[in-house]
Amino acid sequence: RYLLISLIAGAVLLGAYSLFFIAPTYESTAKLYVVSASDDSVVNLSDLNLGTSLTADYEQLMLSYPVLNRVIDRLNLDSTSDELAKAFSLNNPSDTRILEITATSTDPQMAMDLAETMAEEAIDYLPDTMSTLAPNLAQPAKLPESKVAPSYTKFTIIGALLGLLICAA
């Protein structure tokens, strides 16, 4: 009987905690396609290899303070470049010249604005810095339809397990 009460109490307590005290977070992703075309405007193997190298360079420079400060200025944010960098994750899927820019925020509109603005500022700033052609916006950021965290189910199950452990102790 105490086992069941502990199970339910733990589940309810941690589930309620996650529902009322942990702000939901949202993610939005924009994608850039990085390819370099030769002077004759025909993409060849050398251009594709250069595009792959440029993608890795872009990935490193995207979170540099000049780009982040441009995002801060454009969106009138009250944060530092170091703080803003934590809102972004960059991913370059294997064997592609695609660069995924994912922004995370407690506001779905802000997540979309961050990802979209970062992509636009990268397209504008990085080619001049690197003396290359601008990447193409392959996918604009979109408004997230659902939260990515917290998982209420996960917290409820963990709470139930903690309730069982406390009862067993």
Predicted regions, residues:
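Hydrophobic and amphipathic membrane-targeting/association helices
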Residues: R1-A169
